[in-house]
């Protein structure tokens, strides 16, 4: 239908040329134009359905491919949202773990500081007690040594009661 309208339009445009006097050179172009139009019309008549079906198939193929790409794009966007959500959850979990680790480290530090303080105090008490015992032991040995020397020298005489009193006062 469109082809027929085009052919008629072309003929109407060429009609002024037909009314004029023609010489041989002008008729050749008209014949060639008419032959071309007939050739195009015949091609259109035989190939129009095949061309339409081919173009329709290509259109469907492109549409199908576009739908697949859009589905992939949608899946990619959903996957991106899911991964971003997982990333946020991982960040929150990491912050929670770091916070818990800091609290636990502080608790452990406090515990060991307290235990160390108690251990140091116990060591100081034990060392003072040991020093006191050693001082008493040394005093006792010194007093015994002095009394032993004094008894053996026999320059000074002590009664037993005097020795006991001296030992009680010094120890």
UniProtKB/Swiss-Prot annotation:
Membrane topology field? Single-pass membrane protein
* Sequence intervals crossing the membrane: 2-22
Q: Name one GO cellular component term.
A: plasma membrane
- A Pfam cross-reference name: ATP-synt_B
The record's CDD domains line, in alphabetical order, gives: ATP-synt_Fo_b
The record ties this protein, via HAMAP family, to: ATP_synth_b_bprime
Name the family: Belongs to the ATPase B chain family.
Q: Which NCBIfam families match?
A: PRK08475.1
Protein name as it appears in the record: ATP synthase subunit b
What organism does this protein naturally occur in?
A: Helicobacter acinonychis (strain Sheeba)
Q: Which lineage?
A: Bacteria, Pseudomonadati, Campylobacterota, Epsilonproteobacteria, Campylobacterales
């Amino acid at each position: 239908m469109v082809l027929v309208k085009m052919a008629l339009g072309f003929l109407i445009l060429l009609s002024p040329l037909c009314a004029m006097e023609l010489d041989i050179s002008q008729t050749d172009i008209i014949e060639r134009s008419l032959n071309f139009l007939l050739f195009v019309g015949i091609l259109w008549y035989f190939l129009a359905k095949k061309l339409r079906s081919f173009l329709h198939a290509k259109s469907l193929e492109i549409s199908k491919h576009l739908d697949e790409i859009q589905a992939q794009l949608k899946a990619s966007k959903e996957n991106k949202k899911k991964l971003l959500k997982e990333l946020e959850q991982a960040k929150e979990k990491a912050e929670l773990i770091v916070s818990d680790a800091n609290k636990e480290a502080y608790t452990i530090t406090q515990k060991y500081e307290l235990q160390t303080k108690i251990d140091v105090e116990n060591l100081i008490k034990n060392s003072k007690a040991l020093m006191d015992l050693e001082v008493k032991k040394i005093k006792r040995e010194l007093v015994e040594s002095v009394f032993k020397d004094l008894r053996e020298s026999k320059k000074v005489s002590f009664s037993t009661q005097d020795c006991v009193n001296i030992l009680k006062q010094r120890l």
